[in-house]
From Swiss-Prot:
Self-association and partners: Heterotrimer of A, B and C subunits.
Protein name: Aspartyl/glutamyl-tRNA(Asn/Gln) amidotransferase subunit B
Top-rank lineage group of the source organism: Bacteria
Record's keyword terms, sorted: ATP-binding, Ligase, Nucleotide-binding, Protein biosynthesis
Family the entry assigns: Belongs to the GatB/GatE family. GatB subfamily.
Species classification: Bacteria, Pseudomonadati, Myxococcota, Myxococcia, Myxococcales
rRNA processing among keywords: no
E.C. no: 6.3.5.-
Reaction catalysis annotation: L-glutamyl-tRNA(Gln) + L-glutamine + ATP + H2O = L-glutaminyl-tRNA(Gln) + L-glutamate + ADP + phosphate + H(+); L-aspartyl-tRNA(Asn) + L-glutamine + ATP + H2O = L-asparaginyl-tRNA(Asn) + L-glutamate + ADP + phosphate + 2 H(+)
Purpose: Allows the formation of correctly charged Asn-tRNA(Asn) or Gln-tRNA(Gln) through the transamidation of misacylated Asp-tRNA(Asn) or Glu-tRNA(Gln) in organisms which lack either or both of asparaginyl-tRNA or glutaminyl-tRNA synthetases. The reaction takes place in the presence of glutamine and ATP through an activated phospho-Asp-tRNA(Asn) or phospho-Glu-tRNA(Gln).
Pfam entry (one): GatB_N
Length: 484
């Protein structure tokens, strides 16, 4: 029986590090990239006698997340100890939430192939992150433990098994990431591990009512790896079932080099962690007034912003979706539109540059919009140079790249690189005459009905003028000379 006769069933557990300055239960910095164990204290090292104190900002960020996702905010929630042994967990337990999480229910809506899908949520709870095992840190190949990350605040967002393909899982995670970034509670940096997810994957024969045995794939930190891991795991489980072998409930790791999952350990159930209430922390009381204040402070969320871009600015659904996927990019876009001029035509021009050339440059440099030397005002200046006929498309790309990398003013780049467009009819006419004289055969074919050759002539004229001819003037002169 082929894999198409089976239905994959997926639920995601997304771990999002919160953008607080200090850790969840102590005053240590949450900054990424410090020297190993530089951001630690007796609390996050788990030393005897050290007591946790809850960071209020963590609670507020968890509530904001719950409100944005349509969750019920519990007026009373409780921390619990999740007991297990691992070298990067210094206390021998993780402070998390179990029976009484801060948020319950909710949903995430995402778009795939032009259709909206909704995945329901089970809960959102607060917890502390573990440290990080670092391997091959010494000449003898020994491993070390870096506890800088231990105690960094997380929210874990748990979905119901409502996702039915790897593509749905990826789009769900993209939509959730965009919401968290818009809220300002997470930076969306999957590469640094501030947003990562576990996938619970099972398969069942189509038409069956009972879910199959699930396996959990741990700690995927890219959309590509998530898709590859789910697709491999689904195939693996189908092959086991077809061979008459059982699917063992277990925790698995994804190996990106080999593109496959491998067994890590048997899958734990709740009783394996021996949860019990955290005795060193009181219950978390969330007052109704706080909830309403935070509700009133919610920003425009990505789906609403995308709909506004389509309705007010005339952008396509795809372009609007690309812009709102990153809150910093959409804010930069808004500023550029404001600097260049209102209206759908202006917005579409700005969107084309942001989604195209700026996305390419940002991908090359790894820079976030806040670090771009090409400010919204400078992009607006480039667009005005195009509108005035001072530069053309190829020249504009050179200007944008130079400004992006150096921060120079656009008009200065145009002068320094000699990119000003030639609009003088006399100069262009001389180039047109030269091209037509050099290509009599193509001229005859054009006049015989091969009108698509106009592109060839334009290209030859632009080559003759080293790309500086004004395309509109070139086109007009060519058509006049060719008898159109």
């Amino acid at each position: 029986m082929p894999i198409s006769d089976f239905q994959v069933v997926i639920g995601l557990e997304v771990h999002a590090q919160l953008l607080t300055a200090s850790k969840i239960f102590c005053g240590c910095s949450t900054a990424f990239g410090g020297a190993p164990n530089a951001h630690t204290c007796p609390v996050c090292l788990g030393l005897p006698g050290a007591l946790p104190a809850l960071n209020r900002s963590v609670v507020e960020m968890a509530v904001r997340t719950g409100l944005a996702l349509g969750c019920e905010i519990r007026p009373k929630s409780v921390f619990a100890r999740k007991n297990y042994f691992y070298p990067d967990l210094p206390k021998g337990y993780q402070i998390s939430q179990y029976e009484l999480p801060i948020c319950e229910g909710g949903e995430v809506t995402f778009t795939l192939d032009g259709r909206d899908h909704t995945a329901r949520l089970v809960r959102i709870h607060m917890e502390e992150d573990a440290g990080k095992n670092v391997h091959d840190v010494a000449a003898d190949g020994s491993s070390g433990v870096d506890l800088n990350r231990a105690g960094v605040p997380l929210v874990e967002i748990v979905s119901r098994p409502d996702l039915r393909s790897a593509e749905e899982a990826v789009e769900y995670l993209k939509a959730l990431r965009a919401i968290l970034m818009a809220l300002g509670v997470n930076d969306g940096n999957m590469q640094e591990g501030s947003l990562r997810c576990d996938a619970n994957v099972s398969v069942m024969r189509k038409g069956a009512s009972e879910l199959g045995t699930r396996c959990e794939i741990k700690n995927m930190n890219s959309f590509r790896f998530l898709k590859q891991a789910i697709e491999f795991e689904a195939r693996r489980q189908v092959e086991l079932i077809e061979a008459g072998e059982p699917v063992v409930q277990e925790t698995r790791l994804f190996d990106p080099d080999r593109g496959e999952t491998r067994s890590m350990r048997s899958k734990e159930e709740a009783h394996d962690y021996r949860y019990f209430p955290e005795p060193d922390l009181p219950p978390v009381i969330v007052e109704a007034a706080l909830v309403e204040r935070l509700r009133g402070e919610l920003p425009e969320l990505p789906r609403a912003k995308a709909e506004r871009y389509q309705r007010s600015l005339g952008l396509s659904a795809q372009d609007a979706g690309n812009l709102v996927a990153d809150a910093a990019v959409s804010a930069w876009f808004d500023a550029a539109v404001a600097a260049y001029g209102a209206g759908p035509e202006a917005a579409k021009k700005v969107a084309n540059w942001v989604i195209g050339e700026l996305a390419r440059l940002a991908n090359e440099t790894g820079e976030a919009p806040a670090a771009w030397k090409l400010t919204p005002a400078r992009l607006a200046a480039v667009l005005r140079l195009i509108d005035a006929g001072t530069i053309g498309g190829p020249g504009a790309k050179q200007v944008v790249e130079e400004v992006f990398r150096t921060g120079a003013e656009p008009d200065a780049v145009v002068k320094a690189k000699g990119l000003a467009q030639v609009s003088d009819e006399g100069a262009i006419e001389a180039a047109v005459d030269k091209v037509l004289a050099a290509n009599p055969g193509e001229v005859e074919k054009y006049r015989g009905g091969r009108k698509n050759l106009v592109g060839f002539f334009v290209g030859q004229v632009m080559k003759e003028m080293r790309g500086k001819g004004n395309p509109a003037v070139v086109n007009a002169l060519l058509r006049r000379k060719l008898g159109d």
